[in-house]
Structure formats: C-alpha cells, structure tokens
Amino acid sequence: RLAVAAGRRLDDAQPWVDGQLSGVGSGRFTVRLHAVLPPVAAAGTCLSLRVLRPATQDLAALAVAGAITPEAARLLADVITARLAFLVSGGTGAGKTTLLSAALGAVAPHERIVCVEDAPELAPPHPHLVRLVARTANVEGVGEITVRQLVRQALRMRPDRIVVGEVRGAEVVDLLAALNTGHDGGAGTVHANSPEEVPARLEALAALGGLDRAALHSQLAAAVQVLLHVSRGGDGRRRLSEIALLHRDDTGRVSALPAWHVDRGEQRGYQPLLQVIRDRCGR
C-alpha cells in the first residue's frame, strides 16, 4: 500500500521500491520510502522510512542551538553578502539541508531565490522564494521530472540565486553552467566526508553528465568559492565544523584551502577568504 501511495510498483517482478510519500502529518512532512522484498532481502521484507522535516531555522537559531559558532556565523553572513557561491558538504544526517536553509534566510529580502530539490526540504525564512521539486515516474514509467530539467527551467525564472538542494547526479553540470552565466551567490549540498574530498566527488558526478575532469575543474574554479562542512559528533550533535576556500593551483586542479575550523579557529585560508570577500564587496 505504501508503494502504491508513492506511485510506485512493488511485487515479485520489481522486488524493491524507492519513492516519496507526500502530505504526511497534515501536509507538513515528506517521507522517503525504500523497501526490499524477499528473496532479495534474505531475512524478510526490509522497510526504511525517512521523515524529511522542512528546514526552517535561521542562523540565529542555529547559533543558539550551538550548531554554529558566532565567529562562523559572522563569516558566513559576509560570504552571503558578498554573493559568493558555496556548497555545504557532509555525511548523511549531518545537517547539510538545515545549514543551507538557514544561510538562505540571510539573503537580502529583495533577491529572488529559486530552489530545485529532489524532495521538498528547504524552507528558508525568506519572502522571495520559488521552490521546484522533482518528480519520479509513475507506475507506467512516465511523467518523470528530473532535477537536471528543473535547473534548466530555473534559469528562465529570473533568479538572483539558484540553489540545488542536493547535488548527487549529472545536474552538477547544469548547476555549474548556471553559476557561470552571471548567477552569483548560488548554493547546494553534496555528500562528502571532508572539504578536501568535494572536488573528487564532483568529478564523479560530472562524469555522469559527460563533463571531463579538466572541464569540471575549470567550471568549478569559476563558479564556486566556498565550502561549508558539517559533521555529526558521537553525541549526535550536528554543527558547522569547517569552512574552506576553493582555489585553483598551477596544474589547473581545484582544491579546498582550509579557512576556519571549529576547534582550531583561523586556518591558512582565512585571510585569502577575507580578501575574496573584500574584493567582491568593493572594500
């Protein structure tokens, strides 16, 4: 019944399903559904449900909760004011969407933000927000609307900032292209265990869209300036743990230059990041 409610098929011929249940909790939540039937699931039917609560907190609320330090909050506010493009990296459940939504809430109210998502999670406290949500194919296998298609549609909606809730496929090619066509200040999230791993992760995703390594690094260097890395500690606390500046070396490769760490404070990339901010703001 859950599979049918998600518009998907689950039977002996199709023994697994991956879908979304909308309208849960009086329409407040979306639930991601994954199920596998035996004999593929050897011990019996395996069902996984993940509740996606709208991310509505602002930076002040995250600071009160201890998820972001005052110093990091000020630096992030400067990044947003300077319209630097940024990616939020981290593992599953580390708080990437929560931080991204809070950061978008700090964008000037006159700016138009167009968010493209695989599932409706981003709900930043911002008055000029347009949300586009992808759709899976129905039981007949038709009607799919991909994130990549929606990124292209977003370009036609006069956005001041384009945001992709989660970059996990070939849509990275279209996002980077969009950010390189005059749409400064864009953002997104990506799965990675550290800021240093983000370029390699984007290489793999770009390959799905037919973009080779050299082209990816060229596009990335021009499109994205900052990485925000979130982590989840052994006590379950989620926090912004690192800020890095993306820079291109003499070989043409993009790497992450550490700028700030939650335990170690300012890093060697801190002053270069401040200089980029000053240059953008004309200071």
Language-model segments: what does each one mean?
Residues Q219, G234-R283:
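NTP-binding/hydrolysis catalytic cores, primarily Walker-type P-loop NTPases
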Residues A85:
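Walker A (P-loop) ATP-phosphate-binding motif of ABC ATPase nucleotide-binding domains
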Residues R1-A82:
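P-loop NTP-binding catalytic core
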Residues K96:
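Conserved lysine of the Walker
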Residues V88:
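Hydrophobic anchor at the beta1->P-loop junction of P-loop NTPases
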Residues E117, L122-P127, A154-R248:
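Conserved P-loop NTPase nucleotide-binding/switch module
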Residues P54-V64, S101-R152, V198-R201:
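P-loop NTPase switch/communication element
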Residues G93:
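Walker A (P-loop) phosphate-binding loop of P-loop NTPases
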